[in-house]
Amino acid sequence: MRCAIAIAAAIVASLGVVSAQQPAAPQVTYVDAAKVNELFAKPGPLANGADFTASIARRTAAGQVEVHAKETDIFYIVDGSATFVTGGTMVGGKETRPNQMLGTDITGGQTHQLKKGDFISIPAGIPHWFKEVPASGVTYYMVKVVKP
């Protein structure tokens, strides 16, 4: 009987070790309306996970051309407008951090006139660029999905 109890205790203990080694389950992120509205006034991150980031972003000037090797960008335009270029070939690209290049121009890209209510998804590896942003700016909800 003592042997059976010892074996049972060993099994229970080993289950604890196995479960302790399992990665934690993903957590649900909830951000209430007050915090979201606060972020529209002062943009910043909403949520981060192992394979995504979500944030509110605001631009008041043109940016640099970007190419992310492992990130898909998803934008929903909340306010304002911008001229946005996708595809084509990046000019003057330099790696600024692992899996990201920044450049100065795009040749042969497609131009989009983004405005309030528009949605655009830019797959990993596609050059993209806020080419023109009026002084009144553009505010957008951004999700970056990271592929392994």
Language model features with spans:
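Bacterial N-terminal signal peptides that target proteins for export
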Residues: 1-8
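Short, surface-exposed beta-strand-loop junctions and turns on beta-sheet-rich folds
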Residues: 90-92, 136-137
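A short, N-terminal "cap"/entry segment at the start of jelly-roll beta-barrel domains
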Residues: 4, 15-70
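His/acidic/aromatic-lined binding-pocket segments of jelly-roll/cupin-type domains
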Residues: 66, 73-76, 111-112, 119-120
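Conserved metal-binding segment of the jelly-roll/cupin
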Residues: 114-133
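Short, conserved beta-strand element in jelly-roll/cupin
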Residues: 69-90, 96-105
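A short hydrophobic beta-strand segment most commonly corresponding to one strand
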Residues: 135-148
